[in-house]
A protein has these predicted regions:
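Short, solvent-exposed loop/turn and secondary-structure capping segments
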Residues: 101-105, 167-170, 248-250
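A short, structured surface patch at a secondary-structure boundary
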Residues: 51, 56-149, 155-160
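Bacterial Sec-exported substrate-binding components of ABC uptake systems
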Residues: 17-98, 207-236
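Extracytoplasmic substrate-binding proteins
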Residues: 133, 152-244, 268
Length: 269
């Protein structure tokens, strides 16, 4: 059972954030992503194109981003969103991504967060209670638009949902919305590999590559250990929002994480 606990701590921290990873970056070349299926990253001389595939509609695109280095005036196609990188002031709606930004050593780029009371990250809580520190932007489902505008943020990182009807006023204030659909990947390592995208956003590409390599090695090692364990435990996640209790599907990244950790998940099928 010790293996199960360790694998949760080592991987869920990054999700809530064998083969050697090799990334070849040349003009017009795509970064090699081994596990993530809902994202492509293409490097060109002038900018980086990041295409997010729509996990709810096969064959369609959820969002396209053109990452342009700060201080340059590159023109980009009009079929996507231009994002100036590295981000210096971002608003983050989820604990998973705020924690990852801290692990990528870019904590000062967190200017605001949503659902502060649930974001149990010591540095975030400390800075949020300091004058001029991180701003609480309210509930993620009903954010304080005025506070977000006042922050003059470079981008907002949030989670998209199927049939959500869009983001309301957030789409009208001129701040790029980064749709963090990593949770829709069908493997834990696929979800974790999105950190390479977030690394590009924060100017921490090398840190993200190094961190992912560590996660990949640890995950495979611990998963192998767990598969030989004679002890299993039943797993029942608890995420209740209002009157709704959300449970991950058995083939979701979290459901497969339970399987790799040698846990028995009631909704695995």
């Amino acid at each position: 059972m010790r293996q199960l606990i360790v694998i949760f701590l080592s991987v869920l921290t990054l999700l809530s954030c064998g083969n050697t990873h090799k990334q070849q970056v040349v003009k017009g070349s795509q970064s090699e992503l081994q596990y993530a299926h809902n994202i492509t990253i293409e490097h060109t001389k002038d900018y980086v194109t990041v295409r997010l595939l729509n996990p709810w509609k096969e064959g369609s695109t959820l969002h396209t981003y053109y990452l342009v280095k700060r201080g340059t005036q590159e023109n980009v196609p009009d079929d996507g969103t231009k994002v100036v990188v590295p981000l210096q002031r971002s608003v983050i709606f989820t604990t998973a991504h705020a924690n990852l930004v801290e692990m990528l050593k870019a904590p000062r780029a967190i200017a605001g967060v949503a659902d502060l009371r649930y974001m149990i990250i010591p540095d975030v809580q400390r800075r949020a209670h300091r004058k001029g520190g991180i701003v609480d932007c309210g509930d993620a489902m009903k954010p304080d638009i005025e506070r977000i505008i006042d922050l003059r943020a470079d981008a907002i990182l949030l989670s998209p949902f199927e049939n959500s009807g869009g983001y309301g006023r957030l789409e009208q204030i001129g701040i790029p919305l980064i749709e963090c659909a990593d949770y829709m990947e069908t493997s834990a390592l696929g979800r974790a590999e999105w950190m390479k995208f977030y690394g590009l956003l924060y100017g921490k590409e090398h840190e993200a590559d190094s961190l992912f390599t560590i996660v990949e090695q640890n995950y495979k090692s611990l998963s192998k250990q767990a598969s030989h364990s004679k002890i299993t435990r039943s797993v029942l996640p608890d995420r209740k929002v209002g009157a709704v209790w959300y449970l991950p599907g058995g083939e979701s990244s979290i459901g497969l994480l339970y399987k790799d950790a040698h846990g028995r998940y009631a909704y695995s099928n």
